[in-house]
Regions:
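An N-terminal hydrophobic leader/cap segment in hydrolases
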Residues: 1-49, 56-59, 63
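Alpha/beta-hydrolase active-site loop
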Residues: 103-113, 123, 136-158
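Short alpha-helix in the alpha/beta-hydrolase fold that links the catalytic acid
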Residues: 248, 262-271
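Catalytic active-site module of serine/aspartate enzymes centered on a nucleophile-bearing elbow/loop
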Residues: 284, 294-312
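Short, surface-exposed "cap/lid" segments of acyl-processing enzymes
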Residues: 63-114, 118-120
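Hydrolase active-site cap/lid region
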Residues: 179-232, 292
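Short beta-strand/loop motif that positions the catalytic acidic residue
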Residues: 245-247, 252-254, 258
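Acidic catalytic loop of the alpha/beta-hydrolase fold
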Residues: 256-261, 288-289
């Protein structure tokens, strides 16, 4: 009987590990439920190639200025946000209380009202953008090609070529930005500032989740399963080494008691940045990570002030 119980427990453990890895190897694609028009903003649909040719889709929201904010999004989300309030998209996040909608439309409204042009796009494998990198998520180590593609696209448009640029890089989008700055710093030469809600190391995410699941010793199994499923190394998706390339004025934001990671991770990312002008804003009073994504839409002051200081 003990052998049967042990076999069942092993099967359950293996299934849980497989489920965690499948979120990266076979990412769900959530729908784009809103558009800038919902907030009265004129916009056009755009598409452009990533650095490796993957087709990236997005919105361009024009303004009468020489300033441009380029925005991307968290993992499993898209340029609109994330429909976590709807099944099946919120199911995986229910246990942590994150089965709520993330809505980035107010971000774009606040930025436009402050005089910024906006280019918002979907990372590969999300939203309307094409599949790339074998259809797997790289937590930034593949998606950096999309970030560079967005910068090259802005420079390719005559009316945007001389724009003062800021980046609104959220979660995986900030990871991708940091990886891009590490690999191709020359592509970021005219970026003046970054606002970055909640970058995250994948090992910190997995380690925290495994702790909640009562499997704190399973991280090596997850790393092995991830390697087998995606040909990527978990250690390569830890962000502090890439943060060492961030010498641009950067504002980080993070839910301090985030149930899906630890404050030590974002603190290590922040500490590794050599930027002379940098700040870390802790979001208090919640343990829901997705409240961190909704913070700037509801409290735009820090974002508008940061871009105002460094972009103009």
């Amino acid at each position: 009987m003990t052998q049967v119980s042990e076999a069942a427990a092993h099967s359950t453990r293996a299934a849980l590990v497989t489920g965690l890895v499948s979120m990266m190897a076979n990412p769900p694609r959530s729908p784009i439920l809103r558009s800038p028009a919902d907030d009265g903003l004129a916009y056009s649909d755009v598409f452009f190639p990533a650095m490796d040719g993957v087709t990236i889709e997005g919105w361009f929201i024009p303004a009468d200025s020489d300033r441009l904010i380029i925005a991307n999004h968290p993992i499993w989300a898209n340029r609109y946000g994330f429909p976590g309030h709807l099944e099946p998209y919120g199911n995986a996040w229910k246990a942590s209380g994150n089965d709520i909608e993330v809505n980035f439309m107010p971000d774009y409204k606040h930025l436009h009202d402050a005089g910024y042009n906006i280019l918002a796009y979907d990372l590969r494998n999300f939203g309307g953008s094409a599949a790339g990198s074998g259809g797997v998520i790289g937590n930034g180590i593949r998606e950096y090609r999309d970030v560079i593609g967005s910068l090259r696209y802005a420079r390719s448009r005559p009316e945007l070529r001389e724009m003062k640029i800021g980046l609104l890089s959220r979660c995986c989008g900030m990871n991708a930005t940091m990886v891009g700055m590490t690999k191709h710093p020359e592509e970021f030469r005219d970026v003046r500032a970054i606002v970055a809600p909640q970058p995250i190391s994948l090992s910190a995410f997995y380690r925290t989740i495994l702790g909640h699941m009562g499997m704190p010793d399973a991280l090596p199994e997850v790393a092995d399963a991830l390697r087998r499923a995606t040909s990527m190394e978990l250690k390569d998706m830890d962000m502090p080494p890439y943060a060492a390339a961030v010498d641009i004025p950067t504002l980080l934001l993070q839910v301090r008691n985030d149930a899906l990671t630890t404050p030590d991770d974002v603190q290590a990312i922040f500490d590794a940045m050599p930027a002379e002008q940098k700040e870390l804003l802790w979001i208090e009073g919640t343990n829901r990570r997705f409240d961190g994504y909704n913070h700037l839409p509801g409290n735009p002051g820090p974002m508008i002030d940061w871009f105002g200081r460094f972009v103009g």
